[in-house]
């Protein structure tokens, strides 16, 4: 339960830190979609969505990896925890998956003969 609360707070703070504090042009338009913190609060998986193609995604991930130490120290100063979780950034594939499913459903309905 506590890990969920910490994850929600981290999601809010990470969104603010990334949009306002980071000046790396590689990061671009990025959204933190979810943060899952391990039960022992040692690791936080940060799921991100990036606007653009694969190259933009890879560039954004490189920028985040380079700024990981700064981001972690900012989180540590904003959220009171004994130890700030280690950050792991991953792409959130659920949005693309959802869009693909929606497209397939739309195609099925448009191919269906009207009754």
Curated annotation (Swiss-Prot):
Monomer. Binds 30S ribosomal subunits, but not 50S ribosomal subunits or 70S ribosomes. This is Ribosome-binding factor A. HAMAP family: RbfA. One of its GO terms (biological process) is maturation of SSU-rRNA. Gene3D superfamilies: 3.30.300.20. The keyword Cytoplasm applies. GO terms for molecular function: ribosomal small subunit binding. It comes from the Bacteria. The keyword Cytoplasm applies. Transmembrane segments: none annotated. Belongs to the RbfA family. One of its GO terms (cellular component) is cytosol. InterPro entries: KH_dom-like_a/b (IPR015946), RbfA (IPR000238), RbfA_dom_sf (IPR023799), Ribosome-bd_factorA_CS (IPR020053). One of several proteins that assist in the late maturation steps of the functional core of the 30S ribosomal subunit. Associates with free 30S ribosomal subunits (but not with 30S subunits that are part of 70S ribosomes or polysomes). Required for efficient processing of 16S rRNA. May interact with the 5'-terminal helix region of 16S rRNA. It is found in: Cytoplasm. Keywords: Cytoplasm, Ribosome biogenesis.
């Amino acid at each position: 339960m506590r890990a969920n609360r910490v994850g929600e707070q981290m999601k809010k703070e990470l969104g603010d830190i990334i949009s306002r504090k980071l000046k790396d042009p590689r990061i671009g338009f990025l959204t933190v979609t979810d943060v899952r913190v391990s039960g022992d609060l040692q690791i936080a998986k940060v799921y991100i969505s990036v606007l653009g193609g694969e190259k933009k995604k890879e560039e954004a991930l490189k920028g985040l990896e380079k700024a990981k130490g700064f981001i972690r120290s900012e989180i540590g100063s904003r959220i009171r925890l004994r130890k700030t979780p280690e950050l792991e950034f991953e792409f959130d594939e659920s949005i693309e998956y959802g869009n693909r499913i929606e497209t397939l459903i739309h195609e099925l309905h448009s191919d269906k003969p009207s009754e």
